[in-house]
């Protein structure tokens, strides 16, 4: 079985996240995609973070494909970092082929993640195109560090079964929706507290 692991704050989840998930399922030929809602992102301000239960509920609403399984694995495992979560998932599922799925907009800061090289050395990575990222992704530290491990996107269907490090950039339809922009709109609509 091949499973995509798609993690994030999803604060809030939106159609752009669903599009990334659908592209990953289709282009990587995944049996399932685990939509992993994190309780918190160490690189983001947690004061703007909606409760985990709300983000899980909204993610379920956005993720319509039955192959998408919305989870709170980091909370269940009581871990904070993606590298720890992925190690626990792999140990619990030794017969599953996993691929880490991320939007290209996250690639610019991927080198700031705890043990990011370990993630790339232990999991194939599929980077899904996002607006504004198509031309800049090659200059990211991850793309430069692992340039010899890049596969042409025509090999995306076999990426999950490749020995890491292995990664590809998948072009395709893009959504301009952004959680940050959606939160700003919600703040403007909210009644002011005086």
Curated annotation (Swiss-Prot):
Pfam families registered for this protein in UniProt: CTP_transf_like
Gene3D superfamilies, per database record: HUPs
Pathway per the UniProt entry: Cofactor biosynthesis; NAD(+) biosynthesis; deamido-NAD(+) from nicotinate D-ribonucleotide: step 1/1
Record's catalysed reaction(s): nicotinate beta-D-ribonucleotide + ATP + H(+) = deamido-NAD(+) + diphosphate
EC number(s) from the headed UniProt entry: 2.7.7.18
Keyword hit for Transmembrane helix: no
InterPro entries: Cyt_trans-like, NadD/NMNAT, Rossmann-like_a/b/a_fold
GO MF terms, alphabetically ordered: ATP binding; nicotinate-nucleotide adenylyltransferase activity
Keywords, comma-separated and alphabetical: ATP-binding, NAD, Nucleotide-binding, Nucleotidyltransferase, Pyridine nucleotide biosynthesis, Transferase
Gene Ontology process terms (BP): NAD biosynthetic process
Function, in words: Catalyzes the reversible adenylation of nicotinate mononucleotide (NaMN) to nicotinic acid adenine dinucleotide (NaAD).
Family statement drawn from the similarity comment of this UniProt entry: Belongs to the NadD family.
NCBIfam families linked: nicotinate (nicotinamide) nucleotide adenylyltransferase, PRK00071.2-2, PRK00071.2-4
HAMAP family: NaMN_adenylyltr
Name of the protein in question: Probable nicotinate-nucleotide adenylyltransferase
Encoding gene, per UniProt annotation: nadD
């Amino acid at each position: 079985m091949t499973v995509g692991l798609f993690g994030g704050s999803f604060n809030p989840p939106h159609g752009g996240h669903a599009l990334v998930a659908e592209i990953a399922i289709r282009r990587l030929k995944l049996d399932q995609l685990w939509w992993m809602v994190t309780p918190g992102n160490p690189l983001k301000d947690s004061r703007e973070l909606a409760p985990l239960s709300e983000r899980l509920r909204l993610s379920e609403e956005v993720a319509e494909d039955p192959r998408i399984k919305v989870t709170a694995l980091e909370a269940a495992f009581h871990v904070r970092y993606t590298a720890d979560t992925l190690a626990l998932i792999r140990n619990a599922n030794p017969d599953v082929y996993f691929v880490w799925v991320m939007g290209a907009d996250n690639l610019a800061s991927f080198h700031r993640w705890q043990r990011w090289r370990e993630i790339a050395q232990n999991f194939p990575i599929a980077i899904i195109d996002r607006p504004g990222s198509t031309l800049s992704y090659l200059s990211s530290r991850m793309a430069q560090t692992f340039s010899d491990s890049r596969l042409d996107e025509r090999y995306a269907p076999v990426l999950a079964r490749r020995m890491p490090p292995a990664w590809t950039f998948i072009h395709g339809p893009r959504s301009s929706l952004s959680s940050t922009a959606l939160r700003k709109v919600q703040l403007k609509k909210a009644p002011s507290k005086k």
